[in-house]
A protein has these predicted regions:
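Substrate-contacting helices/loops that form the catalytic groove of nucleic-acid
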Residues: 1-63, 151-171
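Positively charged, low-complexity nucleic-acid-binding target-recognition regions
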Residues: 51-55, 63-171
């Protein structure tokens, strides 16, 4: 049973990484940025059964395979720490650092301190709603490329979207 599960998992990883590299090639991207936190699976509490399944997902192995496949196509893969990327707003130009996190916003009496409206929905200072994962992804990019800026008049990121697109991978 474990062998079959592992084979399905690695088959999915190979298909997913191929789709990511193909998507990057179609967009003309030469760099893929991935957020990664050390020991991020240890503090998760989703329930006994879900935790058992979730802990077994080889995130590091997926990154290794993605780096290998991207390197074959001439694409660079960069991993970076994700800290404070989901607590700060890309649209408002906030740097993803401790001083702009929820705790420090609360100390400075900046409201709202937690701008997650619902699960998966983030609100910028001007009220613009953006998918929380998309906001976090743009902040991860800003951690690597700190000179990237966004304004409604000057977009340095081509194809900026506020809601993610869904990619279906047949297993």
């Amino acid at each position: 049973m474990t062998l079959k599960r592992n084979q399905k998992l690695f088959d999915f990883i190979h298909k997913a990484t191929k789709s990511i590299v193909d998507y990057a090639l179609n967009c003309g991207a030469n760099t893929i940025v991935i957020g990664k936190n050390k020991n991020w699976k240890r503090s998760i509490h989703l329930g006994k059964r879900i935790n058992q399944n979730f802990i077994g997902i080889p995130h590091s192995r997926m990154i290794e395979i993605l780096k290998y496949k991207a390197n074959l196509k001439g694409i660079t893969v960069i991993t970076t720490n994700e800290s404070y990327t989901s607590q700060t707003s890309f649209l408002d130009g906030e740097k993803p650092c401790r001083e702009n996190g929820n705790y420090h916003r609360k100390l400075k009496y900046l409201s709202p301190s937690n701008r997650r409206i619902y699960r998966g929905l983030f609100q910028s200072n001007d009220g613009t709603l953006v998918n929380a994962d998309v906001n976090g992804a743009y902040q991860i990019i800003r951690k690597v490329f700190s000179d990237v800026r966004f304004s409604k008049f000057n977009q340095e990121i081509r194809g900026l979207v506020l809601s993610p697109s869904k990619l279906t991978i047949n297993v």
